[in-house]
Amino acid sequence: MVGRRALIVLAHSERTSFNYAMKEAAAAALKKKGWEVVESDLYAMNFNPIISRKDITGKLKDPANFQYPAESVLAYKEGHLSPDIVAEQKKLEAADLVIFQFPLQWFGVPAILKGWFERVFIGEFAYTYAAMYDKGPFRSKKAVLSITTGGSGSMYSLQGIHGDMNVILWPIQSGILHFCGFQVLEPQLTYSIGHTPADARIQILEGWKKRLENIWDETPLYFAPSSLFDLNFQAGFLMKKEVQDEEKNKKFGLSVGHHLGKSIPTDNQIKARK
């Protein structure tokens, strides 16, 4: 894929981990296909995940009543964000594809990655209320989550004790990535890695590399288009009445989050529509 650039964000502390092996496999596979690959190994970088006044290098607008969202937006516009944030934003700006490699921790992303999102995805850079979801700043970019779990796949099924993996993925894939415009590709889910034998691990790595050969051509996951909603505060950003009427008699809702009180479409956050 000549001319394409990928950013791999790794959130695991150990170089001997399977997450690190997945990151290495991804980098090798993409480079083999002609991609330029940049990495953010958050633990190796000792990335600071805590938002604070220190993220702004210039003069604060209201130091007596510090409000991070407002101050960080102003700092972004004026070029006064801390250098570590700016460096990550530049990586994002240059990337066509972003891969997030991490172990599922407490049904979400590791704290260091959550902090990366909070500090790097600054308002006006990553989102605005005038331009969000499929109109967001990153709408020309694609993203994929590559996740390992401790539990088995059955534990994250409809009948499993942990509940439906689609529901777990929604806040990350819709609430963070698609909110900023990303076209989100099917997640790479590696279940129960701690109980997976060596030969099976090799097969997983090879399958991951094979997938990455043509990942740019994959169909993204489905999210309800922003055109289905009245995008203003007066209307409450609610789904348009005519859309609600049209969907009323359908068996399934539109997505995990927009289920409209009906059954959730099967694997809405795991498989793309065919």
From Swiss-Prot:
InterPro entries assigned: Flavodoxin_fold (IPR003680), Flavoprotein-like_sf (IPR029039), NAD(P)H_dehydrogenase_qn (IPR051545)
Gene name in the database record: NQO1
Residues that hold FAD according to the record: H12, F18, N19, Q67, L104, Q105, W106, F107, T148, T149, G150, G151, Y156, R201
Enzymatic reactions: a quinone + NADH + H(+) = a quinol + NAD(+); a quinone + NADPH + H(+) = a quinol + NADP(+); ubiquinone-10 + NADH + H(+) = ubiquinol-10 + NAD(+); menadione + NADH + H(+) = menadiol + NAD(+)
Gene3D superfamilies linked to this entry: 3.40.50.360
Phosphoserine, modified sites: S82
Chief localization: cytoplasm
Quaternary structure (record): Homodimer. Interacts with PDLIM4 isoform 2; this interaction stabilizes PDLIM4 isoform 2 in response to oxidative stress and protects it from ubiquitin-independent degradation by the core 20S proteasome. Interacts with TP73 (via SAM domain); this interaction is NADH-dependent, stabilizes TP73 in response to oxidative stress and protects it from ubiquitin-independent degradation by the 20S proteasome. Interacts with TP53; this interaction is NADH-dependent, stabilizes TP53 in response to oxidative stress and protects it from ubiquitin-independent degradation by the 20S proteasome.
Entry cofactors: FAD
Source organism per UniProt: Homo sapiens
Similarity comment: family membership: Belongs to the NAD(P)H dehydrogenase (quinone) family.
Keyword NAD in annotation: yes
Protein's UniProt name: NAD(P)H dehydrogenase [quinone] 1
Regulation of this protein's activity per its record: Inhibited by dicoumarol.
Molecular function terms from GO: cytochrome-b5 reductase activity, acting on NAD(P)H; identical protein binding; NAD(P)H dehydrogenase (quinone) activity; NADH:ubiquinone reductase (non-electrogenic) activity; NADPH dehydrogenase (quinone) activity; RNA binding
Free-text function comment from the UniProt entry: Flavin-containing quinone reductase that catalyzes two-electron reduction of quinones to hydroquinones using either NADH or NADPH as electron donors. In a ping-pong kinetic mechanism, the electrons are sequentially transferred from NAD(P)H to flavin cofactor and then from reduced flavin to the quinone, bypassing the formation of semiquinone and reactive oxygen species. Regulates cellular redox state primarily through quinone detoxification. Reduces components of plasma membrane redox system such as coenzyme Q and vitamin quinones, producing antioxidant hydroquinone forms.
